[in-house]
Amino acid sequence: MARQRKKKGRPVSGWVVFDKPKGMKSTEAVSKIKWLFHAQKAGHAGTLDPLASGLLPIALGEATKTVPYVMQGKKTYRFHIAWGQERSTDDLEGEITKTSLKRPTQEEILALLPQYTGIILQTPPQFSAIKIAGNRAYDLAREGEVIEIPPREVEIETFKLVETPTKEHSVFEITCGKGTYVRSLARDMGRDLGCYGHIADLRRIAVAPFCEEDLVTWDELKAAISPNKNTTDENENSFEKDFLTLDELLIETGAALDCLPHYPLTDTQAQRVMRGHSIPLSAQKTLLDEEEVCVLYKEQLLAIGTLDKGLFKPKRIFTI
């Protein structure tokens, strides 16, 4: 029988609500956080473009089991649209493809916003992670191919014009559902206003249930460790980690599941759930069969499961 390989790192669990700086890829951010915490496992809940900054939820350990719930959460973005140019990537990185001397008035912009609120059809950018015949759209676009990407429904809950500092650009804030491309909004609004547009700045400020108040920067994380006198290269374990201080910056795993009902368990119930058994659950409110709920043991998240005729059936069990 093959010997199971021991996992490297600490079995640390929780959420780092990371304030990703511009220029850093989401995968790079995950690698840096995983290294810093010396975590066995890490992942993020929703890619943020390299040119964008802001809230990137990074799950460590057991929290990775809750990533799908955060990815379904509403997201809030604040962004600047620069008027007068359309670009190949719909942001500052791309080549200019169309120009216009027209600049929209505030009245024209406000009149357009209702058309972009609610359930709308949106075509993702040519440079996006959408798969076309097994290939990423951005790979095909880099090879010079102009591809047909079918439009899809997205939900925009709120769309506000924050300010128009100059006639050249406007600042907006939206709360939207999964799969919304802010770059597509800039492109489409520019076309509708007859002036063209692209994203000049993009910052994510919320991914439900996390918000700006939860953000932690790379500098704040590094402040929880002390430099190793022997080296200054962080890629060679140049820091002696103060894990106690670092771990205090984590948000508990269960915070990602605020959208689900929570129920405490007795010792006996918890023991059965830990073994994967179903248990009777006395709900404080009427719950539908197949509705997902969380169960807690000693105020710690123990399992996610569904109800079936008053029985709780564990689907995901957490190590506590």
Curated annotation (Swiss-Prot):
Keywords: Isomerase, tRNA processing. It is an enzyme of class 5 (isomerase). It comes from the Bacteria. Its EC number is 5.4.99.25. It catalyses: uridine(55) in tRNA = pseudouridine(55) in tRNA. One of its GO terms (molecular function) is tRNA pseudouridine(55) synthase activity. One of its GO terms (biological process) is tRNA pseudouridine synthesis. The active site is at D49. InterPro entries: PsdUridine_synth_cat_dom_sf, PsdUridine_synth_N, tRNA_psdUridine_synth_TruB, TruB_C. It holds the Pfam family TruB_C_2. Responsible for synthesis of pseudouridine from uracil-55 in the psi GC loop of transfer RNAs. Belongs to the pseudouridine synthase TruB family. Type 1 subfamily. This is tRNA pseudouridine synthase B. The lineage of its organism: Bacteria, Pseudomonadati, Pseudomonadota, Alphaproteobacteria, Hyphomicrobiales.
